[in-house]
A protein has these predicted regions:
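Ubiquitin-like/PB1-type beta-grasp interaction modules and other compact soluble beta-rich domains
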Residues: 1-65
Length: 66
């Protein structure tokens, strides 16, 4: 299935969840935020939110520093 992830076109497996995408990207779920079609997906809903063809997904990680 074709989606846009962080502004880049990407081929994803069918029936993948937001949590599954975070795992594929190699990110730590605890320190990132997810948005699908400009709507924030709460952490508790990531494993239940199945992505669909053509959606736009943004995954943002937190970075410490100073």
């Amino acid at each position: 299935m074709h989606c846009t992830v962080n502004g880049q076109p990407r081929e994803l497996p069918d029936e993948i969840t937001v949590e599954g995408l975070i795992e594929i990207l190699g990110l730590a779920s605890a320190i990132c935020a997810a948005e699908v079609d400009q709507k924030i997906v709460p952490k508790r809903e990531r494993s239940e939110t199945v992505l669909k063809e053509g959606q736009s997904i943004e995954i943002v990680t937190l970075v410490g520093g100073g």
